[in-house]
């Protein structure tokens, strides 16, 4: 039987990788036929360390590349830290 593969897009920061790995372990524990692969990504927000986030697009810079990976079928789901997700009122 061929395992089903689920790809998780995640940032490469230690926190993001820890969270994605945690989700990976939980999914594989609950679904024995599921193989979960992490797709670590460098985001524009992580590259622009010398510029205030507000000047270059805000917190959304940390999630846009992951969302693009979903749209381009390079990942099936994304794991984000809520601190990186923009909030709109």
UniProtKB/Swiss-Prot annotation:
The keyword Secreted does not apply. GO terms for cellular component: cytoplasm. Its EC number is 2.5.1.61. Binds 1 dipyrromethane group covalently. Keywords: Porphyrin biosynthesis, Transferase. Pathway: Porphyrin-containing compound metabolism; protoporphyrin-IX biosynthesis; coproporphyrinogen-III from 5-aminolevulinate: step 2/4. GO terms for biological process: protoporphyrinogen IX biosynthetic process. It is an enzyme of class 2 (transferase). Its cofactor is dipyrromethane. One of its GO terms (molecular function) is hydroxymethylbilane synthase activity. It catalyses: 4 porphobilinogen + H2O = hydroxymethylbilane + 4 NH4(+). PANTHER family: PORPHOBILINOGEN DEAMINASE (PTHR11557:SF0). The porphobilinogen subunits are added to the dipyrromethane group. Belongs to the HMBS family. Monomer. Tetrapolymerization of the monopyrrole PBG into the hydroxymethylbilane pre-uroporphyrinogen in several discrete steps. This is Porphobilinogen deaminase. It comes from Dickeya chrysanthemi.
């Amino acid at each position: 039987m061929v395992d089903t593969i689920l790809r998780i897009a995640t940032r490469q920061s230690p926190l993001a990788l820890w969270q994605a790995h945690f989700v990976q372990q939980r999914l594989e524990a609950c679904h024995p036929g599921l193989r979960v692969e992490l797709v670590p990504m460098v985001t524009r927000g992580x590259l622009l360390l010398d510029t205030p986030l507000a000047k270059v697009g805000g917190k959304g810079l940390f999630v846009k590349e992951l969302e693009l990976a979903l749209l381009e079928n390079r990942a099936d789901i994304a794991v984000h830290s809520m601190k990186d997700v923009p909030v709109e009122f």
